[in-house]
Amino acid sequence: MAKYVMALDQGTTSSRCIIFNERGLIVSVAQREFKQIYPKGGWVEHDPMEIWATQFSVATEAMAKANIEASEIASIGITNQRETTIVWDKRTGLPVYNAIVWQCRRTAQICDELKEKGLTETIRNKTGLVLDAYFSGTKIKWILDNVAGAREEAEKGNLIFGTVDTWLIWNLTKGKVHVTDYSNASRTMIYNIHELKWDDELLEALDIPKSMLPEVKPSSYVYGETNSTLFGSSIPIAGVAGDQQAALFGQMCHQEGTAKSTYGTGCFLLMNTGEKAVKSENGLLTTIAFGIDDKVEYALEGSIFIGGAAIQWLRDELRMLKDSPESERYATAVEDTNGVYMVPAFVGLGAPYWDPYARGAIVGLTRGATKEHFIRATLESLAYQTYDVLNAMREDSGIDLKALRVDGGASANDFLMQFQADILGVPVQRPEVIETTALGAAYLAGLAVGYWKDKKDVAQNWAISKTFEPDMIKERREELLEGWHEAVKRSMNWEKSE
């Protein structure tokens, strides 16, 4: 009897493997970082062979650490950095170019050309996404246009495309399976999220041959099994979701109106909107959350560019902190920020402002402002930005949030989580297992093979470590938010456009 489920968590800076038991608890973890490649300013690449090598090595390491055989693993779930684009030769299995990472801005000009052709609204209506270099479509076009011989080989049917999940499955099955799931397909900018198919009009606009594209399947589904030479015997590959969608599933946000926020370098907020795709009027993305039980659920997504990175800035550039956890001690040493607001718009502002020309600002300084006030204001900025995104979600969906579920590094900061609850006016729930991304992938994989019976079965595993109840009067909350919005205004449109 298989006792465990394995999650492969392929992130932007490292590959991890976590093995979970039936209660959703961690049995074993292995992690390996890999190289970031920056060929030019604004360009970011990874070596696809290194992605595969690190991911395979951590899987074998996690099994060895816990003394687990392949026969004891019920299934494998995969969660991955989204949008990152790989094109390879299906005859040799070798990439024709490095993986172009989601952060890479090299295709901004292709996006401008599509805007000039009047495709902004078409893309928005069909894919739920804003026209941006972030997504995979323009990255595929760039590889076909710029790698010698790539377009000819693609047109002959020899080259295939995949996001990172697809690349891992191809390698795990030794080239037998070319597949992705709904959540990853919905981040390519060439997938119609309403009709659930690759979109011919968008493929034509980007000049991408349809033969390159993987088959799209539900997020909880047996896609194939690992080649038996890899782990000693074959294991079903049965769950796939992009990292943020996997975290939404792992946080048990299975009902319409439930939401989670991941506090990492940036912050990612997703709200489950059920079986309807809500079009945003506030600059949020409409995306597929997951496909499970023969139905597709949608989500609204908002991203905050600078979250935990603002605390790293205090530590590394300003040298105000020895380590990030120390920020909590300083922030709680004062009663408030003494009127100081910090807007961390270091690279512009994301949702709902979308101002690339905004820059970081500190306002409200007086002679009485201290280091403690400054650190507290920086922490508070994460909560204010989260409020802005959730408020936009409420306006778009008409759904009032009942509670916010949190994960990621900065969710361990009790001061920040309490302030978040105060500013939102709803409880903030931090679960016992904060590795929710890997957990979500494990749940999707376990459900597909009957390791867990149904969503109710996995929901029983979800346990709250701590709930932060709002404890601020409405007038004070409104006063603080008014100050924040005034500060944001002053940071906007600072950098001159070229």
Curated annotation (Swiss-Prot):
Record keywords, A-Z: ATP-binding, Glycerol metabolism, Kinase, Nucleotide-binding, Transferase
Associated pathway: Polyol metabolism; glycerol degradation via glycerol kinase pathway; sn-glycerol 3-phosphate from glycerol: step 1/1
Gene Ontology CC: cytosol
Inhibition and activation profile: Activated by phosphorylation and inhibited by fructose 1,6-bisphosphate (FBP).
Catalytic activity, as annotated: glycerol + ATP = sn-glycerol 3-phosphate + ADP + H(+)
Binding site for sn-glycerol 3-phosphate: 12, 82-83, 134, 243
A GO molecular function held by the record: ATP binding
The protein's name in its UniProt record: Glycerol kinase 1
Organism: Clostridium tetani (strain Massachusetts / E88)
